[in-house]
Amino acid sequence: MDSSTLITRLETAKTSFQSLERQLADPDVAADPKLLESIARERARLEPLVLDFEALQHVEQEWQETKQLLRESRGDDAMESLAQEELQQLEARKTVLVRRLTLALLPSDPRDQRSVMLEIRAGAGGNEACLWAGDLARMYERYGQRIGWSVQPLSATEADLGGFRELILSIKGDAVFSQLKFEAGVHRVQRVPATESQGRVHTSTATVAVMPEADAVEVQIDPSELEISTARSGGAGGQNVNKVETAVDLLHKPTGIRVFCTQQRSQLQNRERAMEILRAKLLERQIAEANARESSTRRAQVGTGDRSEKIRTYNYKDNRTTDHRLGRNFSLEPVLTGQLEELIGACIAEEQRHQLEELSHQEED
C-alpha cells in the first residue's frame, strides 16, 4: 500500500472515529441500548488504529524537527551525531507503525467478529477416528476456556467405544471466527491406539468445519422446504429418557442437509438449536461456493475454510504437530491441551503475508 493511499484511508478512519464519539454523546443514542452497543463496538474497533495513526503523525513531526536540527548543526560533530542517532530511532519507530497500520487496514472478513458452530466428524480409522474426534473437541474446549469463550455442545452422536462420530460445539465470544476459521480441514493423527496389542502406529482422521453463526435475516429458510420429525431422546436422564419425544430430526430438502439435535431438554429448544445449526451450515455452503469462484491465489491462502484440505498432522511418537499450510512443526502436548495461540497466530501472520503480496501485485498492475 503506497503512503498516499495509506494516509487517505487513515484520515477516513479518524473522521469515522470522531463521528462515532459524537454519536455516543447523543442522548437519543444513549436511549437505544442496541444502537449504543453497536456504535460503542465500532468505536472500540477503530480506536487502536486511530491511536497508532496519531503516534505516526507525532513521529513524522519529530522527524521533520530533527532533520531541521541536523541542517542547523553542520560543523558541530557532537550535535550532528545526536541528531543522526535520533533520526535512526524515529525511522525505526515509523517503520513499525506503518507496518502495523498497513496490516490493520488489510481487507477483513466481515464475519470475523462472529461466534461459531464448530463441527467435528470422525473420518478414516474406525473407532480410533471417533476417539480422535473427542480429543479434538477437548482441545477446542480448553482453548475456549483459556480465551474466555463460552463452549457448549449443540449436537452429538457418540460412538460405541468412546469418542464421537459427530459433534457440534457452539463457541461464543469476541471475534471467535477470526481465529478458529484456520482450524477448518482434515486433522490427521498418528499414534498407537489403546486397543492395539502389537504396538503399531495407526493413522486416523477427523474433519473440522467452522461455521460462523447466521441469523434468520441473513439466511432465510422456507418452512415448506423442511421435513421435521421427532424421536425419543437419551438426553438429560430421569423420567425424560425414552418417554418424551424431545429429539428433533430436521431435513432441508433442497440441499439434503440433515440436523439431528438431542442436547436440550425440550423439543422446542432442540428445534431452535437445529434451525441455528441449519442456518450456519447453509451460510457455510454459500461461503464455500463464493470461495470456489475466486482466484487460485485467494484459495491458496491459509483461511479458506475448505473442509477437505489436509491441514495438520499430530504425531504422538515424535511429540510433534505439523501444520502443512505453514510448513512448520509445533510441540504436540501444548497443542492438545488447548495452547493454540502460537499456532493460530502463525496462521494469521501467514494470511496477512499473502494479503500484502496480493496488494503489492495490484499496485504494480
UniProtKB/Swiss-Prot annotation:
PTM annotation: Methylated by PrmC. Methylation increases the termination efficiency of RF1.
Keywords annotated in UniProt: Cytoplasm, Methylation, Protein biosynthesis
GO CC field: cytoplasm
Primary location: cytoplasm
Compartment(s) where it occurs, according to its Swiss-Prot or TrEMBL record: Cytoplasm
A Pfam short name: RF-1
Keyword Mitochondrion: no
Record bears the keyword Chaperone: no
SUPFAM superfamilies in UniProt: Release factor
Described purpose of this protein according to its UniProt entry: Peptide chain release factor 1 directs the termination of translation in response to the peptide chain termination codons UAG and UAA.
Family: Belongs to the prokaryotic/mitochondrial release factor family.
Protein's recorded name: Peptide chain release factor 1
